[in-house]
């Protein structure tokens, strides 16, 4: 696992908690300085994490995408069976899709979606606080969005089943279905599809995050077609937009290439 940390803030606090929870305490972290970087981030990171892991601070002017791809390659060690989760803490002062699309992390996410063996996990926070708040969730619940028992959904479930430290794992399906839970191998929750899919997802997720001690990792099976001008489907984009600023929600994209 790898955290790409822009700052040591509330979002990074959540990312460290998540990595410790599902990574068995073992993960790496990297930082590329920018104009707004806190010059003391290395020391503050050490104090916050106790030195495990140390923050790999790269030289100013380094390309974030190249740095992350280099770290991913080192973690995979040329093994095709190794999956690396890249955790991206993203903190916003306000809910703005325009601001989110202009950030360097947006371009990084698009590039990572095309990288074999990489899962991208967004850990967002909307706050003006510039330091960790000092409290994190106690429970981690996973919901795999399951439209049908197809290869994309099975791959997402396989990834979710391999994550330790999870208190509950289920699939989440909206609307009627003509297949059984046994086709996925995990329990399936059925929820009504009322209006837009994104609104229905938010309704179900908020039932879980109403408990402030609970965080929800929404696992999204995503079809990626690198041969098309439009890399991602409109369904996946709409889901990501509705969850990007949602408190206590982590969004993990599990891409399957067409």
Question: Which residues does each PLM region occupy?
Answer:
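Structured cytosolic domains appended to multi-pass membrane proteins
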Residues: 1-253
């Amino acid at each position: 696992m790898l955290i790409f940390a822009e700052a040591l803030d509330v979002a990074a606090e959540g990312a460290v908690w998540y990595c410790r929870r599902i990574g068995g305490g073992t993960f790496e972290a990297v930082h590329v300085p920018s104009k707004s970087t806190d010059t003391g981030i290395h020391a503050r990171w050490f104090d916050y994490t106790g030195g495990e892991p140390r923050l790999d601070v790269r030289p100013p002017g380094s390309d974030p995408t190249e740095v992350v791809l280099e770290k991913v390659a080192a973690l995979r060690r040329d093994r095709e069976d190794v999956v690396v989760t890249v955790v991206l803490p993203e903190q916003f002062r306000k809910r703005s899709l325009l601001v989110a699309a202009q950030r360097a992390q947006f371009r990084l996410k698009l590039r990572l979606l095309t990288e074999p063996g990489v899962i991208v996990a967004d850990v967002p926070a909307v706050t003006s606080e510039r330091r960790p708040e000092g409290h994190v969730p106690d429970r981690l619940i996973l919901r795999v969005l399951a439209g049908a028992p197809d290869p994309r959904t099975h791959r997402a479930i396989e990834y979710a089943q391999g994550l330790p430290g999870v208190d509950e794992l289920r699939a989440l399906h909206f609307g009627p279905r003509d297949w059984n839970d046994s086709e996925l191998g995990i329990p399936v929750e059925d929820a009504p599809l009322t209006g837009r899919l994104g609104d229905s997802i938010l309704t179900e997720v908020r039932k879980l995050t109403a408990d402030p001690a609970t965080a929800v990792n929404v696992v999204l099976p995503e079809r990626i077609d690198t041969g098309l001008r439009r890399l991602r489907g409109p369904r996946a984009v709409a889901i990501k937009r509705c969850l990007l600023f949602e408190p206590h929600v982590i969004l993990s994209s599990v891409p399957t290439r067409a």
